């Protein structure tokens, strides 16, 4: 269900939050890969590394704001409202998507 939803998204996709629950979720999607996708995390120690078990690199928020993806999937669903508001405050204008516990789409 989640793979089908993500594959139908129009435009570019970035992930936000390289916490353990997001990593487990991405790996649970199986062999399916988000091609040309990156993850953003504000934790400096995670930046420049890859999410375990994937080819998804963790980048900075500055990279995200320059790239301006059409969709941001917020992986840390328990912090989604705070993350969404901070992205809006930073000037993000695309779709904000939370996949867990169920799919929710908001427009920035």
Each language-model region and where it sits:
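Hydrophobic, well-ordered beta-alpha structural blocks that scaffold small-molecule cofactor pockets
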Residues: 1-108
């Amino acid at each position: 269900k989640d793979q089908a939803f993500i594959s139908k998204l129009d435009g570019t996709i970035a992930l936000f939050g390289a916490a353990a629950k997001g990593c487990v979720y991405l790996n649970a999607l199986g062999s399916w890969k988000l091609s040309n996708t990156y993850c953003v995390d504000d934790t400096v120690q995670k930046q420049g590394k890859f999410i375990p078990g994937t080819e998804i690199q963790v980048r900075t928020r500055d990279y995200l704001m320059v790239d301006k993806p059409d969709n941001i999937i917020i992986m840390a669903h328990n912090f989604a409202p705070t993350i969404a508001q901070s992205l809006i405050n930073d000037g993000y204008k695309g779709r904000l998507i939370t996949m867990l516990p169920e799919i929710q789409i908001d427009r920035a």
